Amino acid sequence: MTTQKKQAVTIKGTKDGLTFHLDDRCSFDSIVGELAEKLSSKHYQMEDQPRIQVKVDVGYRYLTVEQKRHIQELITDGRNLDVEEFVSQVMTKEEAEEKRKEAQIVSVAKVIRSGQVFSVDGDLLLIGDVNPGGTIRASGNIFVIGSLRGIAHAGYKGNGEAVIATSHMAPAQLRIGEQIFHWSKEEQQAGDRIMECAYIASDTNEIQLDRVQKLLKIRPNLATFLDEMVEQ
């Protein structure tokens, strides 16, 4: 009885193209050798055929830039294959640090004055006012226990799920992700709108204003922040 040799490389077709699974328990040299052998088939050597997108799943393996380049060249050179992405379950130190920053909550008690820009990674809880001409930015959500009269930009790295909530809403401008909401002079002169929030509505993909309590329905995970704001 012969034992079937475990494959270092498995190629599977998907609706979007091909997925190359590279066994993370095999040596890199074994993977390169088997990959070259499988790609030697004439099936993968038709440059004049439509391009096929390839996803390379490396599992719990960390690949250096040079190793990725080597695998990418092996897959694409002389073939109708394009590497779309490498998928790994391992994060680099830089990626882990970035993820930590995005998950953090920065609490600050201060007044943002005209001309000042205050920016953080993660969520921002500001206890104080944002005066006209002042700007606050966060890669996550923004909560202001005070008056927001300047500019607030939540999700400034492209997070359209971020929200803005404030005790007193009368900003010059609101931004969430790539969306912008301009506050009219008439609205500013009408006075503060108490305990309001801003978020991107899923049906219109535009910034919508509502009572802070609305966030309990659309973002229930923010209940702790909202309870603190209401108590203030």
UniProtKB/Swiss-Prot annotation:
Subunit-structure text: Interacts with MinD and FtsZ.
Which keywords label this protein?
Answer: Cell cycle, Cell division, Septation
Q: Any coiled-coil ranges, and where?
A: none
Decide whether keyword Transport is in the record.
no
Q: What is this protein called?
A: Probable septum site-determining protein MinC
Q: Does the keyword Disulfide bond apply?
A: no
Q: Name one Pfam family in it.
A: MinC_N_1
UniProt function note: Cell division inhibitor that blocks the formation of polar Z ring septums. Rapidly oscillates between the poles of the cell to destabilize FtsZ filaments that have formed before they mature into polar Z rings. Prevents FtsZ polymerization.
Instruction: Say which family it is in.
Output: Belongs to the MinC family.
Q: Name one GO biological process term.
A: cell morphogenesis
- What domain of life does the UniProt record list for this protein's source? Bacteria
Which SUPFAM superfamilies does the entry mention? Answer: Cell-division inhibitor MinC, C-terminal domain (SSF63848)
